UniProtKB/Swiss-Prot annotation:
<keyword id="KW-0862">Zinc</keyword>
<protein>
    <recommendedName>
        <fullName>4,5-DOPA dioxygenase extradiol</fullName>
        <ecNumber>1.13.11.29</ecNumber>
    </recommendedName>
</protein>
<comment type="subunit">
    <text>Monomer.</text>
</comment>
<comment type="similarity">
    <text>Belongs to the DODA-type extradiol aromatic ring-opening dioxygenase family.</text>
</comment>
<dbReference type="GO" id="GO:0050297">
    <property type="term" value="F:stizolobate synthase activity"/>
</dbReference>
<dbReference type="InterPro" id="IPR014436">
    <property type="entry name" value="Extradiol_dOase_DODA"/>
</dbReference>
<keyword id="KW-0963">Cytoplasm</keyword>
<feature type="binding site">
    <location>
        <position position="15"/>
    </location>
    <ligand>
        <name>Zn(2+)</name>
    </ligand>
</feature>
<dbReference type="GO" id="GO:0005737">
    <property type="term" value="C:cytoplasm"/>
</dbReference>
<dbReference type="Pfam" id="PF02900">
    <property type="entry name" value="LigB"/>
</dbReference>
<feature type="binding site">
    <location>
        <position position="175"/>
    </location>
    <ligand>
        <name>Zn(2+)</name>
    </ligand>
</feature>
<comment type="pathway">
    <text>Pigment biosynthesis; betalain biosynthesis.</text>
</comment>
<dbReference type="GO" id="GO:0008198">
    <property type="term" value="F:ferrous iron binding"/>
</dbReference>
<feature type="binding site">
    <location>
        <position position="53"/>
    </location>
    <ligand>
        <name>Zn(2+)</name>
    </ligand>
</feature>
<keyword id="KW-0223">Dioxygenase</keyword>
<dbReference type="GO" id="GO:0008270">
    <property type="term" value="F:zinc ion binding"/>
</dbReference>
<keyword id="KW-0560">Oxidoreductase</keyword>
Amino acid sequence: MGSEDNIKETFFISHGTPMMAIDDSKPSKKFLESWREKIFSKKPKAILVISAHWETDQPSVNVVDINDTIYDFRGFPARLYQFKYSAPGSPELANRIQDLLAGSGFKSVNTDKKRGLDHGAWVPLMLMYPEADIPVCQLSVQSHLDGTHHYKLGQALAPLKDEGVLIIGSGSATHPSNGTPPCSDGVAPWAAAFDSWLETALTNGSYEEVNKYETKAPNWKLAHPWPEHFYPLHVAMGAAGENSKAELIHNSWDGGIMSYGSYKFTST
């Protein structure tokens, strides 16, 4: 991987529910299907996905030759359990990730030689890169730690961009609890306020505010009662760097409470 493979962008994608794979009425599905045409036309050497649906005590990376498709959901249409996204893995990239994290002071970086791709990874990737011909590695989140930890993970991984690796955080701009009632009339005010705060903070480059969102963001406890769907954003943000420019590249809603806000970060 040489300098000609340089990638300036990292991304955060709100992946929603697994239904995005089959529900043509979802604007987020059309957005991801148009990925190469409208958002990112370059074919990366490999893809690193940080998914909300892999939580571990220490940073962990999967080391496999071929990625299995994990059906980590229940009660959905049978068709969803028939999809296969058998993208190759990349043990070489996994080793590089370990080295970068260790070199940045992360004392324990684990490997998982059995794990494939959960729906936070394969559902969007199936829409973005349906050929499944690009090697994919997945990195876990540590939901018991904070945004700054995940931002530093991203900072450590930034050299991968110069090696042709596309870094994608996959979570959700808002991810309320299952018991949160949907809004029957537009977007719930609490969700709109958080979503607007996030867009303003990111596009203004106020990344430290986003790292410390628990003291800065309105209604954060409603938007993210658990943080695992937010932390992939921090990794993408950290990998882009503090002087990068953030841009909202998609926004739509489920039930007026779940935001599909998705962002591109471009390094200067």
